[in-house]
Amino acid sequence: MSTPLVVVVGPPAAGKTRVSKRLAKALGVSCVDTDALVVNQWGPIPEIFAAQGEPFFREKERLAVIEALGTSGVVALGGGAVMDAQTREDLEDHRVALITISPEAVAPRLDNQKRPLVKDGLESWKALVASRADLYDSVASRKFDASHQTVDNLAEEILRWVREDAGL
């Protein structure tokens, strides 16, 4: 069974997908995004939430996590994936990069309606992040702050760590 070089976690709009794609490109490996897996099979996340509800989405997200953790390369988990106890347990055996971001830095990213749990803006994002902070911390091998750097710089910082930690 394959295992990812790194799993990227963090709150909604922290930049997990963009950073993960850059990491994968730099490492010459694939990138698997669990949100994309769910969307490919079940449709847009806001529509899933509206029609089926969050519990249905979380079930499908868990299946996507299982699939993604069986691949090599870089894996980006959806912001809420760490809420699942089995996912947290599964991550114990993986190199996990936690991307953090300040409310001020994330605010401009919250203007769209693609994120059903933070559609009410910054205050709902803050509450959501506060409710998950301990879960993110519990799975993180290392934290990286995205608040004051570009996606490319953040990806480079994580890349250095992965190469050093994996002996690449």
Model-found features: residue ranges?
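Post-Walker A helix-loop "phosphate-sensing" segment adjacent to the P-loop in P-loop NTPases
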Residues: K25-T34
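ATP-dependent small-molecule kinase phosphotransfer cores
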Residues: D33-D90
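A glycine- and Lys/Arg-enriched "phosphate-lid" helix/loop adjacent to the NTP-binding pocket
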Residues: D93-L135
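Short glycine-rich anion-binding loops that position phosphate/pyrophosphate groups of nucleotides
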Residues: G79-V82, S102-E104, Q149
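NTP-dependent small-molecule kinase module
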Residues: S2, R18, A26, A133-L168
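Conserved glycine(s) of the Walker
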Residues: G15
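Hydrophobic anchor at the beta1->P-loop junction of P-loop NTPases
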Residues: V8
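P-loop (Walker A) phosphate-binding loop of NTP-binding proteins
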Residues: P11
